[in-house]
């Protein structure tokens, strides 16, 4: 893709010097002289919304010594071509074609789209222009005219006009199969066949917008609307053979396939399902900028081993759906969109999505609106040998800058499949501390076409190891320093990623809360992947006998029965657990966080509790064996008995002194 800026000026007149003050002449010229920017692709030229008119007028009015405009200024444009798949010769030819087609227009008219069409006779070239006007206060840009342009050959220095079709409110567009579509407006019907699927998709998008605008404005023949189309009607100057092609192709390709029999509906549905499954595979390995719809159908016929002539319109319809999915930016996170070059060139979509930062991961794609958005470029080709890993630290910082401002960022490459998808995966792995498998599953759920090439996948695996090692070192530093890691080890093993999809409805704050909850979730799971720390050990111990723990909590009001049970020796080691959970900030006893105990101290505590419990039980049995008739020993033994019970169960009153 390339960005071309064309200077628009009226044709030079025969007058020598304008009559009147010089500043009035400059102002009149500045109103007419302006620039228009185009995104030039293979087979299509997309007019961009350019805000340079007022700037040009200001510059023109501030330079009274500027020369009068002439037709030569049309060639003094600014061009910025990326090294895409097209050869320099093809790029120069397409650029020259754009200049020649602009010369056919009035100064107040704009090209919204120029799409190259298939030509019946190969030396010739044909373009479809979607043209709107800016003439006068009363006219709006809702008025659109389709123009057909003929070139004798690719190197021709001139072009001619062969078709003029105003778009009225009754305009209808139909798919005719094999990449062709027909436009019916005002009783006239014309057929067009772009040279590639991507060109067809871009053309249909612009046509749909124009048809909706015409319908909303109520443009009907016979009124004052679209009177400027007569200017082009009077200038149809293509050869008669070219004029016949613009009108006769509708009769050649508008034939509809016969309707299916009622009994064959189930078989037809099965065939359509098979076509959908194979179509995705064919498109995945095809270059949408060069492949035609007919070639796609032929590839499907080879895969299925059946003729698909009667499914031409169905194939085109499914292709448009898949291309639309490729063309639409996918919202991966509340603040991050993943898309293609089309999304980067769509100013309306960028503004609607509140995008302020654009991360361009492609070597061949330009920055279309450098004056409107903040850009960061990583100029790499989609090759397995390309090194993305060294750039992921900068891209993460760039994305976080947009999130910190409360705005959104678009990450794009050419198709939003490999380079940009790998960068978004790297961001998710670092930002949300998840594994590569979790990040890939999340991204592909929201954008199924995201498939980094094998080289980028290997770099993502290396990056995953780097992140894991970094988190492990951070945890060990906390352990050496005696600081409780609390929630940090949880995402180290596995951080659930599903809580992220509901977050597009909220902001970044909700995202942080959701991630904290997801990090805390593994703590409640019954010991999957036990860690080498005290929390994991105590969790495993507590899960050995959960029923006994419930019994101990329900019988706290009756202390003597705890030691009268034959399972008291098994229950006592569980008593230190509430204290340890309490010291680690657990949820069993809410008494606030305390300094963490080391593992050696915890083992000593467990042993001491067991000794106290055993001695207490032995003392109780000895007192009970002395007889029922002695009242004073029994009375004196009761307070001591309750005192020892409290020391063993509460564990925070005076256990060290008693031991």
Curated annotation (Swiss-Prot):
Residues 1-31, 46-96, 482-534, 547-603, 617-638 are annotated as: Disordered. One of its GO terms (molecular function) is phosphoprotein phosphatase activity. One of its GO terms (cellular component) is cytoplasm. The active site is at 413 (phosphocysteine intermediate). The modification Phosphoserine is found at residues 9, 37, 85, 87. Disulfide bonds: none annotated. Residues 1-16, 80-89 have a biased composition (Polar residues). Residues 64-78 have a biased composition (Basic and acidic residues). The keyword Acetylation applies. Its EC number is 3.1.3.16, 3.1.3.48. Does not bind to, or colocalize with, filamentous actin. This is Protein phosphatase Slingshot homolog 3. It comes from Homo sapiens.
């Amino acid at each position: 893709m390339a960005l071309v800026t064309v200077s628009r000026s009226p044709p030079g007149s025969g007058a020598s010097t304008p009559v009147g003050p010089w500043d009035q002449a400059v102002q009149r010229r500045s109103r007419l002289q302006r620039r228009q920017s185009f995104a030039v692709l293979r087979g299509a030229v997309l007019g961009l919304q350019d805000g340079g008119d007022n700037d040009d007028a200001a510059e023109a009015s501030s330079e009274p010594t500027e020369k009068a405009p002439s037709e030569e200024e049309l060639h003094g444009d600014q061009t910025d071509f990326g090294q895409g798949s097209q050869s320099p010769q093809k790029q120069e030819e397409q650029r020259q074609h754009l200049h020649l087609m602009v010369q056919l227009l009035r100064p107040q008219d704009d090209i919204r789209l120029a799409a190259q069409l298939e030509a019946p006779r190969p030396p010739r070239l044909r373009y479809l222009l979607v043209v709107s006007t800016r003439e006068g206060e009363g006219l709006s840009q809702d008025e659109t005219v389709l123009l057909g342009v003929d070139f004798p050959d690719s190197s021709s220095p001139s072009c001619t006009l062969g078709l003029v079709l105003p778009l009225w409110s009754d305009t209808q567009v139909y798919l005719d199969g094999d990449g062709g579509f027909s436009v019916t407006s005002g009783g006239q019907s014309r057929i067009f066949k772009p040279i590639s699927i991507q060109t067809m998709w871009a053309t249909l998008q612009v046509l749909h917008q124009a048809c909706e605008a015409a319908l909303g404005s109520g443009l009907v023949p016979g009124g004052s609307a679209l009177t400027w189309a007569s200017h082009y009607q009077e200038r149809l100057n293509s050869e008669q053979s070219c004029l016949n092609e613009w009108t006769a192709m509708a009769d050649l390709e508008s034939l509809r396939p016969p309707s299916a029999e009622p009994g064959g509906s189930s078989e037809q549905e099965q065939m359509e399902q098979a076509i959908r499954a194979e179509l995705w595979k064919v498109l995945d390995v095809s270059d949408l900028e060069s492949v035609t719809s007919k070639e796609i159908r032929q590839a499907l016929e080879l895969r299925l081993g059946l003729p698909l002539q009667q499914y031409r319109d169905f194939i085109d319809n499914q292709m448009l759906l898949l291309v639309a999915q490729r063309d639409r930016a996918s919202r991966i996170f509340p603040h991050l969109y993943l898309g293609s070059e089309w999304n980067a060139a769509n100013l309306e979509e960028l503004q609607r999505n509140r995008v302020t930062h654009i991360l361009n991961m492609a070597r061949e794609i330009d920055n279309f609106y450098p004056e409107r958005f903040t850009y960061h470029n990583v100029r790499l080709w989609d090759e397995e040998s390309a090194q993305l890993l060294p750039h992921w630290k900068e891209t993460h910082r760039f994305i976080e800058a947009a999130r910190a401002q409360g705005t959104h960022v678009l990450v794009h490459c050419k198709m939003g499949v490999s380079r940009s998808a790998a960068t978004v995966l790297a961001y998710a792995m670092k930002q949300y501390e998840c594994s590569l498998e979790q990040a890939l599953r999340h991204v592909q759920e929201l954008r199924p076409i995201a498939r980094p090439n094998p080289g980028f996948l290997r770099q993502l695996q290396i990056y995953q190891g780097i992140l894991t090692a970094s988190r492990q070192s951070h945890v060990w530093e906390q352990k050496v320093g005696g600081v409780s890691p609390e929630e940090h080890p949880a995402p180290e093993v596995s951080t659930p990623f599903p809580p992220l999809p509901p977050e597009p409805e909220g902001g970044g704050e909700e995202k942080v809360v959701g991630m904290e909850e997801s990090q805390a979730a593994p703590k409640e799971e019954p010991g999957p992947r036990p860690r080498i720390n005290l929390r994991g050990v105590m969790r495993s111990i507590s899960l050995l006998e959960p029923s006994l723990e419930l019994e101990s909590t329900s019988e706290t009001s009756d202390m003597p029965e705890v030691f009268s049970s034959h399972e008291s020796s098994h229950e006592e080691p569980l008593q230190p657990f509430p204290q340890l959970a309490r010291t680690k900030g657990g949820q069993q006893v809410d008494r606030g966080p305390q300094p963490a105990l080391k593992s050696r101290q915890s083992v000593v505590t467990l042993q001491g509790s067991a000794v106290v419990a055993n001695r207490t039980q032995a003392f109780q049995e000895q007192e009970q064996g002395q007889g029922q008739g002695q009242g004073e020993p029994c009375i004196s033994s009761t307070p001591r008995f309750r005192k020892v019970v409290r020391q063993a169960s509460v564990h925070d009153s005076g256990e060290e002194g008693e031991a």
